[in-house]
Amino acid sequence: MSALRCSVCSAPLHPDGRSLRCVRRHSFDLAKQGYVNLLRAGVDAGTADTSEMAAARADFLATGRYAPLVDVLARVVEASGEPEFVVDAGAGTGYYLAGVLDRVASAWGLALDVSAPALRRAAKAHPRIGAVVWNLWEPWPVADGVADVVLDVFAPRNTAEFHRVLRPGGLLAVATPGAGHLRELVTELGLLDIAGDKTDRIAESLGDHFEPVDVDTASHTAELDADEVRKLVLMGPNAHHLHRGGLGAKLDALTGATEVTFEFDVSVLRRKE
């Protein structure tokens, strides 16, 4: 991973046995699960996905309910030409990045996420993924102008770092829930509501560094059994709010099947020179 930089001094990192090391001898051990933690300090409780959330996400995404979103993201990466390096900011378990790399044989991927439990899975999700524990709100340990595409799927958006790590003319794909996403569960279970007009606000917030290219939407409905609904809820931010409105009790009481809408918006933007 020659694109990685030391999180202490910003010098290039190079493999040294089971570690990554810079010329100033700052060293970071590779975990046996295949990822590296470059954080300099601990993370506040609640900001990272837990082991339980990562497990629920892996199980639910394996059902293929979010495969249409992978298709959209893969088309964006393919449209960038012959990409060599894709950064997934907030990669989680690596599901989306692995799906993209399956379609784009020329590319390697870097999964950045603050959750070590999630990155244990991301590191094994695809042979061309490198996984790094990092807080996306901090300057990333990645060299300038090395990425052909940056993916941001339901994750924090650090505009300055998007711009810095992308090559001139590189593409940014920001995936957000559509207005109808999980609407049945929002009504039935009282999930956190989905904000409207996100795509307009994304283009506006990134406008100083990026120009809009396209907005693509993928939507479908599927019948989920009670266990699938539980995993769907527990893999995301609602897992931090199980006591809100008795959500945990409502999940425990679920029986039968529920028709659920899945809707994803992908805003594609190009890095300004």
Where are these regions (language model features)?
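Conserved class I S-adenosyl-L-methionine
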Residues: 171-201
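A short SAM/SAH-binding and catalytic strip from SAM-dependent methyltransferases
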Residues: 147-161, 176
